[in-house]
């Protein structure tokens, strides 16, 4: 397999990648790679439209080994591309040579990176990959590394997703281990911003619990922000969708920043206490803002981080690590009104009660052993008072 990297030889870069994976594993961290198998770049080894790579790409020669990967209506300039972007020619996913290159060859793309230490793949635009392709890929991954993880980019409820006229079989045929939980993000945003009640959030969570296999439900990628969405800090207060030029220079006011930061505390608390695997987009813990791509991909603000916010996320991470009920427990909602949300997480004979006060008024709740809390105003023998926009966890 040809691996082209900018600095150093493929062997040197392979060793560097393996060292990265080994260092991550020593710290209990798994490493996923982003697999984009629905299209390539036009300026790539395989298509080579600009002639920047050695060898003959599909654009350069009809005898290219990659010619069968692409759909040409009139070679070389008329070809099928991803959503009409001519810089992203679409791939024939079930082309035998493409299948061998990506999946089945001894040193296929999948095999190569798993052998170097990769722990799985996030599959870009999974809706555009045929069921047969997904099944082959996941089976090959599990053959080489049984505990590796295959995550699909799906924006809707993946259990009943229809794409290109077909009902997808992501879970029925074990094509994916899990998906990116965008419905979760939408429900959290709508609740925190007061657009929906706690009932709408509950309905979203319980619909996924009912529709997804249990093991998928508990390892869903619960996200608040990604490279495909506005920064969560921005999304919590600013709906601006004007032209790119206006987005580039748009910044939150001091008041907006204060409101967004407080809302982020609550949103992240729910992210780490509801079922699923919380995913933190780099910089969200440092108070980064920004609208859509590319303004959500700015450099990390080294030396200008919000340390209190970072410590908040560290506390949430330790909380989830230490409480099996938050990782594996059942969920039952007991409060889901316009202002308040309450649910239990139960596992192994232990029950945690989770409270979230979205309102600007105090909320009295039953007393219990405090496991985690923010904005607790009163701690009495029989009750606790959550302050405005406060949240806490108690144990019976």
Language model features by range: what are they?
Residues 21, 39, 48, 52-55, ...:
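Active-site-proximal helices and loops of the catalytic beta/alpha 8
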Residues 260-261, 273-280, 284-396:
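Carbohydrate-interacting/catalytic domains
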Residues 1-26:
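N-terminal beta1-alpha1-beta2 submodule of the flavodoxin-like/Rossmannoid cofactor-binding fold
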Residues 32-33, 120-122, 149-152, 220-223, ...:
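Structural recognition of the beta-strand scaffold that forms the well-ordered cores
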Residues 164-165, 221-252, 268-307:
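Aromatic/acidic polysaccharide-binding cleft in carbohydrate-active enzymes
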Residues 24, 34, 113, 123, ...:
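Conserved, mostly hydrophobic/aromatic
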Residues 21-115, 137, 143:
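Substrate-binding/active-site clefts of carbohydrate-active enzymes
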Residues 85-101, 118-128, 188-196, 248-259, ...:
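The substrate-binding groove and active-site-proximal loops of carbohydrate-active enzymes
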């Amino acid at each position: 397999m040809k691996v082209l990297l900018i600095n150093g030889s493929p062997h040197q870069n392979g060793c560097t990648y393996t060292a990265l994976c080994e260092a991550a594993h020593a710290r209990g961290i798994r490493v996923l790679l982003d697999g984009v198998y629905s299209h390539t770049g036009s300026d790539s080894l395989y298509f080579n439209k600009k002639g920047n790579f050695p060898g003959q790409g599909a654009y350069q020669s009809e005898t290219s080994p990659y010619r069968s990967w692409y759909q040409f209506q009139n070679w070389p300039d008329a070809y099928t591309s991803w959503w009409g972007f001519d810089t992203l020619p679409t791939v024939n996913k079930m082309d035998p040579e493409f299948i061998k290159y990506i999946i089945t060859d001894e040193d296929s793309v999948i095999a190569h990176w798993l052998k170097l230490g990769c722990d799985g793949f996030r599959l870009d635009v999974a809706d555009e990959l045929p069921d047969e392709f997904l099944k082959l890929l996941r089976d090959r991954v599990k053959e080489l590394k049984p505990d590796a993880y295959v995550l699909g980019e799906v924006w809707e409820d993946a259990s009943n997703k229809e794409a290109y006229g077909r009902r997808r079989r992501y879970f029925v045929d074990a094509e994916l281990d899990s998906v990116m939980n965008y419905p979760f993000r939408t429900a959290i945003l709508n609740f925190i911003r007061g657009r929906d009640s706690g009932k709408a959030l509950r309905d979203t969570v319980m619909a996924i619990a009912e529709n997804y296999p249990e093991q998928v439900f508990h390892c869903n990628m619960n996200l608040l922000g990604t490279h495909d969405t506005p920064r969560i800090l921005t999304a919590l207060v600013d709906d601006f969708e004007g032209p790119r030029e206006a987005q580039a220079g748009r910044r939150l006011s001091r008041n907006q920043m204060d409101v967004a930061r407080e809302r982020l505390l609550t949103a992240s608390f729910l992210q780490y206490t509801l079922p699923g695997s919380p995913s933190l987009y780099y910089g969200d813990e440092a108070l980064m803002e920004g609208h859509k791509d590319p303004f959500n991909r700015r450099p990390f603000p080294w030396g200008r981080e919000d340390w209190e916010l970072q410590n908040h996320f560290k506390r949430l991470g330790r909380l989830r690590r230490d409480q099996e009920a938050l990782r594996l427990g059942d969920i039952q909602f007991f409060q889901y009104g316009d202002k308040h949300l309450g649910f239990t997480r139960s596992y192994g004979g232990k029950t945690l009660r989770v409270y979230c006060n979205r309102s600007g008024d105090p909320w009295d709740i039953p007393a219990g052993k405090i496991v985690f809390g923010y904005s607790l105003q009163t701690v009495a023998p029989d009750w606790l008072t959550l302050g405005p926009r406060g949240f806490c966890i108690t144990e019976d």
